[in-house]
Every structure is written in structure tokens, then in C-alpha cells.
Design a protein with these regions (language model features):
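Flexible, compositionally biased loop and terminal segments
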Residues: 1-301
Length: 301
């Protein structure tokens, strides 16, 4: 399949899951087990083949992004535990040049982080021009886990008068403004919520417990957070409603089938890069003469 065909197919696969306007979004309308027209077992090999072709196309587009050195791309991943963020990042980005990619995983904020505003640690890790930046969790934790567990807010050292009833509304506004600022400065933001079902999460947790090679992935806190499942779903839904925009859309990706999740994420990244009209820089006459002189010198020896 040619690159143009891959880009066209990628757009068709990503489009059903892209949210440009969050007002009418409802999480219940997204089936975590959805695979579009892919039949799970019969079409799984076809999906893996599509991902492999997509990885090759992505590598070509990233090379142009790096050479052109005009745009930066920021990919934000949010999800419940065991939804497959790490695997999606690993498989989709497997073919790109590490020199042009920056990956940051944001866990609980450090003491230094808490001495700054909540966007600080993410802002200082934004991708350079020509690079793809990946945030595995992000500033969105501030309207997710901090909202579900308000006690975390007390650790942020905010003046009491700034912690009012409108704090979440204010944070959504901050984030929208921040992402608009990035868009106006050539940083293309794309956000992914990998939507796994509670049932599938349970299965994956049990697999991590039963498989010695996966024990390291499991934390007892992962299981206890399931008690707050409904609270998290409400927080995710409002987060998407309040921060999905044309310049920084959310992709709400079904995550019960990892192979399908990876195809959709890969398709969205390809579609994003293809929309930037990337090309290798053209050299001027002076540079062409310089190249000709260098070639002549090399051939003469």
C-alpha cells in the first residue's frame, strides 16, 4: 500500500473516535470493546499488518517533520490503569528516529513540582520544533486524580482563597488557554483517552498477578482505585467535554482490544502529521553551488 493510501485509510480509522467539540460528548456512547468493521479473531492479523504499514509511513513523516524543523507535535495519553498506554506508545512509535522523539511519564508530583504551578513540570518538557513529544499522563491529572481525591489538592500549597467551588472550571479554562497558546506557536496537540472497561481492567490485573513476568506491573493501589471507578468516569467525561477543541481534539479510543487500540492511535498520529504539509527543505542556489564544489573536490581525489 502506498503512503497516500495509508494516510487516507488512517484518516478513515481515526475520524470516528475524534472529538473536536466536547459539549455533546457522553462517555456511555463509546463502547470499549468496539473494533469498527474488524472481526476480532479473523481480522486481527489484518489489523497488525495495517499497523506495520502505518509504522513505516509514520517513520517517513517523522523524518520530514524533523528535517523541516517548523512544527512540534505533542501526544498526550490518559487512561485508567492497565488500559494499554505503554503498549500503544511502544508499538505505534516503534519505527521512529529516537533523536526526534521525547517521552515523558508523569507520576505523582515531586516536592520540587509542588513548589511550582501545576503546568510547570509539563511546560518544561514540551517538545522541540521538529520533534514529537509524548506525555504518558500529563497536566490532565490535575482534573482527574486530584479531583477524585481532593486531599491531593491540599499538598499543592495554594493560597486557601484560590481553592474555591470554581477551581475545576478554572483549571479547564487554564488548560484550554494553554493548548491554544501551543497551537498558535506551532505545537500540534493531540490527546488520547484509552477507554478500557472495568471488566477488562480486572482481567488484566489478574493476569499481572498470576504471571511472574508481569508482577512488577501491579501495585495494590491499582486495585484500590477501582473503588472510585464511577468518579473517574465522571471526571474523564467532563474533562473531554470541557477541553476538546478543533486545535487540540481528544481521541476516545476503545481499549479492550489492544491490537485495535494501537491501530487507531497510529492512524490518528499519521493523520495529524500528514495534515502539516511536511516536506524536506529545498536548498537555495548558494547551497547548490556549495554542494557542486564539494562533489568536484571529492571526485578529484
Amino acid at each position: 500500500m502506498k503512503t497516500k493510501e495509508i494516510i487516507k485509510t488512517a484518516g478513515e480509522l481515526a475520524e470516528p473516535f475524534r472529538i473536536n467539540k466536547g459539549k455533546d460528548f457522553r462517555l456511555k456512547d463509546v463502547d470499549p470493546d468496539d473494533t469498527l468493521d474488524f472481526t476480532k479473531e479473523a481480522d486481527k492479523p489484518r489489523a497488525k499488518e495495517a499497523l506495520a504499514m502505518g509504522v513505516a509511513a509514520l517513520a517517513e513523516l517523522q523524518d520530514k517533520l524533523y528535517a523541516q524543523d517548523k512544527w512540534a507535535v505533542l501526544l498526550v495519553f490518559q487512561a485508567m490503569d492497565a488500559a494499554g498506554k505503554d503498549g500503544a506508545i511502544k508499538h505505534v512509535m516503534s519505527g521512529i528516529n529516537p533523536q526526534g522523539c521525547q517521552v515523558n511519564s508523569f507520576k505523582s508530583p515531586s516536592a520540587e513540582d509542588l513548589d511550582h504551578d501545576y503546568l510547570w513540570r509539563c511546560m518544561k518538557n514540551l517538545p522541540n520544533r521538529g520533534h514529537i513529544g509524548i506525555f504518558n499522563r500529563s497536566y490532565y491529572e490535575e482534573v482527574l486524580v486530584v479531583r477524585v481525591h481532593p486531599e491531593f489538592l491540599a499538598k499543592e500549597k495554594l493560597p486557601p482563597k484560590l481553592v474555591g467551588k470554581k477551581i475545576w472550571e478554572e483549571r479547564f479554562e487554564d488548560i484550554r488557554n494553554f493548548e491554544q497558546y501551543l497551537a498558535r506557536n506551532g505545537v500540534v496537540v493531540r490527546k488520547f483517552f484509552l477507554h478500557v472497561s472495568k471488566k477488562e481492567q480486572k482481567r488484566r490485573f489478574l493476569e499481572r498477578i498470576d504471571d511472574p513476568l508481569k508482577n512488577w506491573k501491579f501495585s495494590s493501589n491499582d486495585a484500590s482505585e477501582r473503588d472510585f471507578w464511577d468518579d473517574y468516569m465522571e471526571a474523564y467525561e467532563e474533562m473531554i467535554q470541557e477541553t476538546a477543541t478543533k486545535d487540540a481534539p481528544w481521541y476516545v479510543v476503545p481499549a479492550d482490544n489492544k491490537w485495535f487500540t494501537r491501530v487507531v492511535v497510529g492512524s490518528a498520529v499519521i493523520e495529524t502529521l500528514a495534515s502539516l504539509d511536511l516536506a524536506y527543505p529545498k536548498v537555495d542556489e548558494g547551497k547548490l553551488k556549495e554542494l557542486a564544489t564539494a562533489k568536484k573536490k571529492l571526485l578529484s581525489k
